[in-house]
Amino acid sequence: MSTVITSVDAGSPAERAGIRAGEQLLMINHHEIVDVLDYRFFCYDPSVSLRLREADGTTRHLTIEKEEGEDLGLNFDTYLMDEPRPCSNHCLFCFVDQMPPNMRDTLYFKDDDARLSFLMGNYITLTNLTEREAQRIIDLRISPINVSVQATEPQLRRTLLGNKDADKSLEYMRAFGEAGIEMNGQIVVCPGWNDGEHLRRSIEDLMDIGFNSCSIVPVGLTKFRKGLARLEPVTKEKAGEIIDLVDEYGARCLEKYGTRMFFCADEFYIKAERPLPGEEYYEEYQQLDNGVGMLRSTMNEFLSGLEDAESGDVASFTVATGKAAEPFIARLVAEAKKKFPQLRGEVVGIVNDFFGHSITVSGLVTAQDLVAQLKDRPTLGERVLIPANMLRHGEGVFLDDYTVEQVEQALGRRLTISETDGYSLCDAIFRQEP
């Protein structure tokens, strides 16, 4: 583990106390600091006692007075103060196993780290946890934990996760529920494996455990599945069945608990060719990051932003998105044109030749497909708008390692990056750019 302090934030409690980069944090309030969870938990109090080791090996103690919950302002070599824990499963539906060869190494790393669940919202299977670590989650009141459930029948969960001990983590879920640890769940539906009565059983078990919410999402299948288990995609009929089952239990939960608890991802409605539910269905949009309510939220936000738009005299544009969202984004652009008839713009759903045509989400569109399908398009706008989820977080790089600048050069157009909410899309369309 790395508890060596690499920098101290200016003006922070730690800087005011004279803590310097290069010192090692050993203890807070007489508790050994193992990783970032210990650090976050034990420095919450308004008065904290620190034990530090200086570069020459000597140790010193000091007490810092600060606001309750205020961060000390210490930074470490890695965010976790430790290495992320790799996944020990061999899931039948694992997307990483379906990646093409020769991509950057980080895309092949599978994490399954409870700390990243709490800190970053990652979904984890809990199969990496030891009993001691599970107890630490309870003791430190680490919450919420986001859990990849997949199934609650022990043998089925072992099979789906490719882990002979996968059923043990079901005990952790129950222990967390009894201890009041908040949990959100995710079930990836693989037709013929964990749908139908198996899905019904999983939902009923999670109701008993007491999850805050659970998303039901369709399995994603790329064209790179040679040597992997045979899985079938979610069909129109199957999508309708899943929606009906989830809505049945959602209505029960709403009556009993005041929340639907279980929500289908937008992709199910697209596949079933059914209209999206109204905004009230999604409650607080608890599962937005899993694609639950993303389209409804975007549509409502865009139309709200459109009310404040004042002029359609902007450069022509092409909105590039995934095939799944294409008709919805096209509807929004049509609404914008109703208000501003002079607006010149189009929406293009990019066919995913890179991963396979069954992959339709915008977050998996590559630069190669983007360029190939737009470069010779006669109606290509003066600006090309893309959602930020096409790029690596915080970087101007696509999944296939092409940069924004390379794509701009290939298209001869400037890219406008829009966040994935409707307000940002509206702003990007009506933005006056030099």
Which residues fall in each region the model found?
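Terminal peptide-recognition signature
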Residues: 14, 22-25, 50, 94
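Flexible glycine/acidic-rich beta-alpha junction loops that bind and position SAM and/or redox cofactors
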Residues: 157, 193, 210-237, 257-279, ...
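Short, structured beta-strand/loop micro-motifs enriched in basic residues and often containing a Trp
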Residues: 2-10, 30-33
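Conserved Radical SAM active-site core
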Residues: 59, 66-209, 220-249
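Structural preference for beta-strand elements that scaffold enzyme active sites
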Residues: 144-146, 182-184, 213-215, 261-263, ...
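Conserved PDZ fold ligand-binding element
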Residues: 16-34
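Radical SAM enzyme core and accessory elements
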Residues: 4, 273-434
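PDZ-domain C-terminal substructure recognizer with occasional recognition of PDZ-binding tails
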Residues: 40-76
